[in-house]
Structure formats: structure tokens, C-alpha cells
UniProtKB/Swiss-Prot annotation:
Known role: Catalyzes the reversible transfer of the terminal phosphate group between ATP and AMP. Plays an important role in cellular energy homeostasis and in adenine nucleotide metabolism.
Pfam families linked: ADK, ADK_lid
Keywords assigned by UniProt, alphabetized: ATP-binding, Cytoplasm, Kinase, Nucleotide biosynthesis, Nucleotide-binding, Transferase
Primary enzyme class: transferase
Organism: Baumannia cicadellinicola subsp. Homalodisca coagulata
Positions of the UniProt region annotated as LID: 122-159
Full protein name: Adenylate kinase
Coiled coil location: none
Length: 213
């Protein structure tokens, strides 16, 4: 089972990716996680990526493609994988096809921008563990502190409102041709589904299971 999961930041993509990974036993490949890992290594590539992200811009196709190519040739992807947030441009989609990276299903999570902004702004992260909090929806027990370790929480640059709005504009511009591309991909035996994600997590889980079986 080879799946692409697409959706704007804050659409619930990460939560659903974890659900799919556990239920169907395939690895979750997140381009966001790979990029953050590269940034944390403080290499030249990591510093370049960090500068791009701080401006709220998307990382260039070629950089992301190279990271994904290295990941999907690993053994745990031999029986399937879940690509989270990739491809996000036509160049990336074409590069996947040229490289012989075939997928079976594309899931696109759709949710209004206003709701996405409310979800993301106010989000806080415990970087060592990846635990995520929100000042309104999931506040920590102690303000600004991780519940488990008591360590400080941070607000990522890409979770600030101006950055989120800028990213959403870029996301929509990129997604229109991507959606068209995969909706017309029936000749390559790719099934594409757009799912209303403005619903409780359990409801969204059920919608996805009905599609994947």
C-alpha cells in the first residue's frame, strides 16, 4: 500500500499519518521531519534550509527530492509507505514518476484556512520529544512547560501567524496543479480522494478507513 497524504499545515495531516502507519503497518515518511532533522544537524545544507523556512518559503524541489529518494530505498519501504506532504509541486510529482516511485492512493485533506490559522497559531512544541501543545486546544499543565519533563516549550517560526498565512497562500498555489495531476492519473492506476477534514479526529479516521479498506 503506497499512499500520498496531502493537506495544508494544520489540516490534521500528521495525526492521520500516525493513524494510517499504525493501522496498516507501513512507515510514515514526513518531509517536514526530514527537513527539521537536517536543520538540526547544523550542516551547510541545514543552515540553507533553515533560512528558507524562517522566511516562510517552501524548500526548493531538488533539496526535498534528494531527501525523499534516500529514504524510500530503505528496506522498510519495500511493502509500502506513506508519504506525508510530498509531492507538493508538479516538479516533484514528475520526478517521482521518472524515478519509478509508484503510488496507489492519494488522500487530500481539505479544511478552511480560517480554521487552520486558529489551530496553528498558539501551538507550542517540546523539541526533544516532539510533543505539541496549544494555548487553547491543548494547554500544558504549567504555562510554557512540557508536562513530562518540565522543560521549556517553544513556538516555531513557521507556527507564527504571518508565516502561516504566507505558507497557506503558497500551499494553495502549489496544490491546484497537483490536485489536477492526480485526479487525471487514472491511466496510471492512481486513485485520488479529497476528504473534508473539518471534523473530529475519530470521524476523519473512519473516512480514511472506508477508502483504504
Amino acid at each position: 500500500m503506497r499512499i500520498i497524504l496531502l493537506g495544508a499545515p494544520g489540516s490534521g495531516k500528521g495525526t492521520q499519518a500516525q493513524f494510517i502507519m499504525k493501522k496498516y503497518g507501513i512507515p510514515h515518511i514526513s518531509t517536514g521531519d526530514m527537513l527539521r532533522t537536517t536543520v538540526n544537524k547544523e550542516s551547510v545544507l541545514g543552515k540553507n534550509i533553515q533560512a528558507i523556512i524562517k522566511l516562510g518559503n517552501l524548500v526548493p524541489d531538488q533539496l526535498v527530492i534528494e531527501l525523499v529518494k534516500e529514504r524510500i530505498i530503505q528496506y522498510d519501504c519495500s511493502k509500502g509507505f506513506l508519504l506525508d506532504g510530498f509531492p507538493r509541486t508538479l516538479t516533484q510529482a514528475y520526478a517521482m514518476e521518472v524515478a519509478g516511485i509508484n503510488v496507489d492512493i492519494v488522500l487530500i485533506l481539505r479544511i478552511p484556512d480560517k480554521i487552520i490559522i486558529n489551530r496553528i497559531v498558539g501551538r507550542m512544541v517540546h523539541e526533544p520529544s516532539g510533543r505539541i501543545y496549544h494555548v487553547t486546544f491543548n494547554p500544558p499543565k504549567q504555562k510554557g512547560k512540557d508536562d513530562i519533563t518540565g522543560e521549556n516549550l517553544i513556538i516555531r517560526q513557521d507556527d507564527k501567524e504571518d508565516t502561516v498565512r504566507h505558507r497557506l497562500i503558497g500551499y494553495h498555489q502549489q496544490m491546484i496543479p497537483i490536485i489536477t495531476y492526480y485526479n487525471n492519473a487514472n491511466i496510471r492506476n492512481i486513485r485520488c480522494f479529497t476528504i473534508d477534514a473539518n471534523c473530529p479526529i475519530s470521524t476523519l479516521n473512519e473516512k480514511i478507513v472506508r477508502i483504504l479498506g
